[in-house]
């Protein structure tokens, strides 16, 4: 277990400072082919179970919504729509990590890197969905995942990343108390050692529909965007 005091992290606040007028946030997808339960008009040619290369229906579409929502808050956002996990799932983190490094080299003003995914919740062949209790429409939940140095590998930024995650979680919880799942800390780095301000964000699960994920990420962005805009200097 990793000892964490949420109250202390909230009191510290995020270490992240976003530069004005330059690219600030990168959204990308290590597993871009991750898709959702087909429903309504959101039917897609599957390349594997709940996966598709069609960016109209996979997590890249959800990334488009997040990028636009954050941009509406005045943030400078880049969205890498490249599919790094197809045709080979193996090595996708190596490929996406190399791409992140290229972005950091090209845009040194970047301060936040979001690797946007959808989760997979299964048990005994039963697929589960996440549900935010909202009055108007079905909506998935969102989870922030923070890698640590618990594996012994180099990762000097994980506590700063956690401070950012706690800051965002608090901002979203204030507006939508059921939207966020608990923050998850893991032993693995998931490329988050490459730069400060790195987070994995999981929107929904394979049991959710695309529209449920879109509603969730839009609500997340509408709260997280203004919170991030307050970090611009």
Where are the predicted features?
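Non-catalytic propeptide/linker segments at domain boundaries
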Residues: 1-30, 35-39
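Solvent-exposed loop/turn segments at secondary-structure junctions
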Residues: 32-35, 83-87, 118-123, 149-152, ...
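A solvent-exposed, charged loop/short amphipathic helix patch at secondary-structure junctions
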Residues: 38-54
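Catalytic-core regions of hydrolytic enzymes
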Residues: 52-131
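Soluble non-cytosolic domains of exported or imported proteins
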Residues: 53-61, 90-94, 155-163, 207-215
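Active-site-adjacent substrate-binding region
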Residues: 157-184
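Active-site-adjacent mobile loop/cap segments within catalytic or ligand-binding domains
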Residues: 180-233
